[in-house]
Each structure stands twice: as C-alpha cells, then as structure tokens.
C-alpha cells in the first residue's frame, strides 16, 4: 500500500459520470475536475514554528480534484493518483 509523505494524498479516481449531491456536472465541469476517493493521506505539513497541521481530508472521503493534477501511479494492478492537498477542490458530503 502507498503511504504518502507530507501534505500529499493518494486518490482512486471514480470512472463514471460525475455527480455532486445528485446533480450531474456539466460537460465542461467534468473536463476540469474528477471525482475520487481518498485512499491514504500524509501526516500533514509543519508550520514555521514546527506545529503539525493535519490534512483536512481523511481516508474514505469522496473529493473533487483538478482534472490534470497529480502523478499517476500503480500499486499492483490498481491505478491511483498522488496529489498535493491544495489540488483537492472540495469534499463531497453525501
């Protein structure tokens, strides 16, 4: 299993038509974003004075992420992307 460092997040992209709260996203919005599930998170980032700031997402969250963000990786047969937390646009609450 992949364990990201810092503020990075491992995501599993959902390969289906994107909806948010039951609304289908317009075609142009789908081209700019992807829906994904958080698989793993890094420990967070440290502030200038050394305090650790935990990620705002957690394993299992569904998120909206920039379409071209991140790095494609494989772990066995599974495909994931690793993104910085700043590339996550929103948490999708069901």
Swiss-Prot record:
A Pfam cross-reference name: Cpn10
Cited Gene3D superfamilies: GroES chaperonin (2.30.33.40)
Top-level division of the source organism's lineage: Bacteria
Protein name: Co-chaperonin GroES
Main localisation: cytoplasm
The gene coding this protein: groES
InterPro entries, per database record: Chaperonin_GroES, Chaperonin_GroES_sf, GroES-like_sf
Described purpose of this protein according to its UniProt entry: Together with the chaperonin GroEL, plays an essential role in assisting protein folding. The GroEL-GroES system forms a nano-cage that allows encapsulation of the non-native substrate proteins and provides a physical environment optimized to promote and accelerate protein folding. GroES binds to the apical surface of the GroEL ring, thereby capping the opening of the GroEL channel.
GO BP, one annotated term: chaperone cofactor-dependent protein refolding
Keyword Isomerase: no
Keywords assigned by UniProt, alphabetized: Chaperone, Cytoplasm
Subunit structure of this chain's protein: Heptamer of 7 subunits arranged in a ring. Interacts with the chaperonin GroEL.
